[in-house]
Amino acid sequence: MSLISAVPLASSCVSKSLISSVREHTALRRAIATLQMSRRGKSVAASIRMSSATAGSDDGVKRRIGDYHSNLWDDNFIQSLSSPYGASSYGEHADRLIGEVKEIFNSFSIADGELISPVNDLLQQLWMVDNVERLGIDRHFQTEIKVALDYVYRYWSEEGIGCGRDSAFTDLNTTALAFRIFRLHGYTVSSDVFEHFKDQKGQFAASANDTELQTRSVFNLFRASLIAFPEEKVLEEAEKFAAAYLKAALQTLPVSGLSREIQYVFDYRWHSNLPRLEARSYIDILADNTISGTPDANTKKLLELAKLEFNIFHSVQQKELQCLWRWWKEWGCPELTFIRHRYVEFYTLVSGIDMVPEHATFRLSCVKTCHLITILDDMYDTFGTIDELRLFTAAVKRWDPSATECLPEYMKGVYMVLYETVNEMAKEAQKSQRRDTLGYVRQALEDYIGSYLKEAEWIATGYVPTFQEYFENGKLSSGHRIATLQPILTLSIPFPHHILQEIDFPSKFNDYAASILRLRGDTRCYKADSARGEEASCISCYMRDNPGSTQEDALNLINGMIEDMIKKLNWEFLRPDNNAPISSKKHAFNISRGLHHFYNYRDGYSVASKETKDLVIKTVLEPVLM
């Protein structure tokens, strides 16, 4: 059985659409609402139920249970999803619009030594780059973006940059926007440039007259501060100043595009932002501005292309989600009643960080890997006995179907879906990498399961480790490495050994990403984990190491560690002197952002909160109105 199916992309026309008009669009939202109401009653019984076929409920073994709700998404509803945007005519229309947007980029070029653009040419080009990136359509304009940034960078100085090449003064808005874009694209820029925008007291300050330009300038300063590297004190100061200023501004600003942009960045900072969610949000903002004002032709063209691209990928998402549903059903995953069934939520996350239609194999591999991680997590954390888990761990090291002979019945199915899926993904990776990568993945899997077994033994014996002991093991059990390694190997991007060393364990990149996931996950889950009998967490271990400390003390320390790790991860991702180019690290970094997104405010992974359900609806189930 092929576990990574060849998914039809945006090429086949679907005969009937749920989205071809406002009426049908409204009907889809009502169907989703009705579905959620009907499923809500089923998810109230949160404790895990065991079936004799899968969980040995009649074996007389006392087992711990989880407190997870059931799958929220009805099978028939998933299978009924359809979209007309896979038709070739939409792709042809998108190609024409792409050509027209390229002409906009080219209109800023120089002919016969004369600039064909207004006096604010630098800001205009930065605006174009920023907008195509926020709208999720930048992959079509990589050459144009490079030309634009190379041109603007020629005018960059230690004191910043003005809105035009002939500007007599630098300004904060253009400088902050340029700094952020340059850093994200690997250009060398120093944060010391912002020292020139402080007052005589050495502090950031705003004028008494609040204007939209001033608010926009501080907004771009705040965005720039979020990609700080370690020891950049000026960006720490900029973040504090900008955050306070913008929070106050939100109290007085009318509801507008700018206020919604500010709120979005507060809600989803760069390290937990999903590009597709940002695209959806920014499309809505620009669309509202178009209705309420008189947009220029460039904005209208960008918006038209962004909407069309969003909906074309929407048709891809539906096919891939249905493919995952078949895989999930064929392997009998719904019958494993002790696990969290979150394939829809996982797919939403993964398609939120990669919107390239041709990357179907990456997305499917990533979702399947995350679902396998969930099965193992729930089996080791709650359901399996310590003796069963030792048998399973030994079987994984053997890596042979015959190893199932000594396993309990429910574990045999778990072992085989793990074995077959990992092997099938390794075959896909071999096509991309031109070498066998199964050895890499098996070692990562053994390390991962070994860390789970250690935690299971702690639970079984009542042992509470030191903070450092728990943290080091927790970086492995976070699952970041296994969630990242095999999926990125299926990409067409080459990952020779020297580049893989910069991303995979024991690289600093992997260490910081795994640390963030472990620490943030614990701050969101420690109360629920403790209720299930899992005494060890970053919070409890810190308090045990430091008698007299409180939960608040532990959380303050851990939140500080997370902020520090985010800056270190930024550096490992964007450092210009790294052996691995940014393009090679981008997917691994975005997986880290996606996983962090699940824990943005709460455990959106175990409990599909309103925010999680809204995310599924806005980025997967619901198209944008053209």
From Swiss-Prot:
Motif (DDXXD motif): 377-381
Record-linked InterPro entries: Isoprenoid_synthase_dom_sf, Terpene_cyclase-like_1_C, Terpene_cyclase_plant_C1, Terpene_synth_N, Terpene_synth_N_sf, Terpene_synthase-like, Terpene_synthase_metal-bd, Terpenoid_cyclase/PrenylTrfase
GO cellular component: chloroplast
Pathway named in the protein's UniProt entry: Terpene metabolism; oleoresin biosynthesis; Secondary metabolite biosynthesis; terpenoid biosynthesis
Cofactor: Mg(2+); Mn(2+)
GO molecular function: magnesium ion binding; terpene synthase activity
Catalytic activities: (2E)-geranyl diphosphate = (+)-car-3-ene + diphosphate
Transit peptide: 1-45
Annotated cofactor note: Binds 3 Mg(2+) or Mn(2+) ions per subunit.
Chain sites annotated for binding Mg(2+) 3: 529
Predominant cellular place of this UniProt entry's protein: plastid
Annotated Mg(2+) 1 binding sites: 377, 381
Cross-referenced SUPFAM superfamilies: Terpenoid cyclases/Protein prenyltransferases (SSF48239), Terpenoid synthases (SSF48576)
Catalytic class of the enzyme: lyase
A Pfam short name: Terpene_synth_C
Keyword hit for Calcium: no
Family recorded in the similarity comment: Belongs to the terpene synthase family. Tpsd subfamily.
Domain commentary: The Asp-Asp-Xaa-Xaa-Asp/Glu (DDXXD/E) motif is important for the catalytic activity, presumably through binding to Mg(2+).
Physiological role: Monoterpene synthase (TPS) involved in the biosynthesis of monoterpene natural products included in conifer oleoresin secretions and volatile emissions; these compounds contribute to biotic and abiotic stress defense against herbivores and pathogens. Catalyzes the conversion of (2E)-geranyl diphosphate (GPP) to (+)-3-carene.
Protein name per its UniProtKB record: (+)-3-carene synthase 2, chloroplastic
